[in-house]
């Protein structure tokens, strides 16, 4: 396992978990991926890392299956490949899959994992980037705090960019009822 993967794992949320196995996925024409199978008590997760230590995804391993079939290379259309090369120069393609009629492409760009989604006719729909709360603009945080979800705990934050707008999707959970919601706020602080 490369030092960058080990360092990223040891600095991440799963550092205290036991590493049960490490798989190296070599795929023609796509990024090499390392899969760390980690466990704690009855929970198991597969953590997918790029060679340079970017955490690509965290997947609960409910069946103990380690075939990683969802990481098999998918052929991308020229339109999608050209768009990615133009909008994200130097991006490395990690994975691509068809889901609900859309094509979702996972890339690494500027040291971050991004998911780029294309719809009918390979039109770009949006790009999603996971971000830390500290990276969210103050105006967006203030909007969340003044909303009905202001006292709820924050589970996850994603930044979305589409052809016509940029917004944050903030997953929150009520500490009393454990109800969950996703709050969408434009980059200027407008609640959607």
Question: Each predicted region: which residue ranges?
Answer:
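Interaction-mediating elements
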Residues: 1-60, 64-192
